[in-house]
């Protein structure tokens, strides 16, 4: 009888290394380990050999960076998606792509089951499993961390030693860290107390603002229809542009975020994020929208931005709602083209200037100099009509009080 196959989202860490052996024994199945590169800086070399040494029957490494930027990050940037107005959704954006890649491998390898290493307390289990349900509802989903017998890292280490599973014996960081090109999330340890300032060792890439250079960096960012395309006059691919902005921002202490956020599972959590490029680009993009979007579109888009952010955070990327919102967002971005000049200095991003061929700012109408072309006499009639409803309301109230 043909053995069943399980596609496992594999990072090479302790949890997923132990999972290969555990799943293989529990389900008498072959394990296909799947790793996706979203631009994380942590060690991803030698994962194939490690997976095979741990007992995997197959291994798939997928470079997803370009797809991540073009099909996930840019749509979220155009939408202005910041969860609860702060978090640029780095981890949340990466999950549907990783889940999709896992499904693709599972289908190509004729797997009957699919497994992930998410805990039963976090958001990621929702994001992975909702994506699985959307793309391959026939696959059985396995979540070992919700059901296996290990209740501590030490128990997992003992299991690994017993079965000859190669895992790192170094001291575990007190923090839980997830990283991709759009940002880094940091939690646990002393960070669980919301009154404790994050220690410097919690931050992975950004310089402390106090230790950042005393000279500011000035950067010109060009956009075409809401998408960043150039830095300082140099046309760049999206991936390269984000990498360069991350370096500039991190060096100047930009992109440190500290928030209490509402998780999908109903609890509040304290999260620390580092997102230099995301912070800079969201800021610059919004300022260009202020210049180019008509008033009612600009104001209504705030609602759409929050809806889009919630959709990403809650794990429903592959949904009719996201496709519908993309239609609205794309329509708003047709004229979000131009240049934004920003200054990076000791943790802050400051606007220095912006210009666009689609600018709705008319200096002759806005000026208070002799060049003013605004018809001041028209204001009297406008104010009369604009306030007519309130005037009528007040008159009726006054008459009825007599």
Swiss-Prot record:
It is found in: Cytoplasm. Coiled coil: none annotated. One of its GO terms (cellular component) is cytoplasm. PROSITE patterns: ARGININOSUCCIN_SYN_1, ARGININOSUCCIN_SYN_2. InterPro entries: Arginosuc_syn_C, Arginosuc_syn_N, Arginosuc_synth, Arginosuc_synth_CS, Arginosuc_synth_type_1_subfam, AS_cat/multimer_dom_body, Rossmann-like_a/b/a_fold. One of its GO terms (biological process) is L-arginine biosynthetic process. The keyword Signal does not apply. Pathway: Amino-acid biosynthesis; L-arginine biosynthesis; L-arginine from L-ornithine and carbamoyl phosphate: step 2/3. L-citrulline binds at residues 87, 123, 127, 176, 185, 261, 273. Gene3D superfamilies: Argininosuccinate synthetase, chain A, domain 2, HUPs, Single helix bin. ATP binds at residues 9-17, 117. The keyword Nucleotide-binding applies. SUPFAM superfamilies: Adenine nucleotide alpha hydrolases-like (SSF52402), Argininosuccinate synthetase, C-terminal domain (SSF69864). L-aspartate binds at residues 119, 123-124. Its EC number is 6.3.4.5. GO terms for molecular function: argininosuccinate synthase activity; ATP binding. It comes from the Bacteria. Homotetramer. PANTHER family: ARGININOSUCCINATE SYNTHASE. Belongs to the argininosuccinate synthase family. Type 1 subfamily. This is Argininosuccinate synthase.
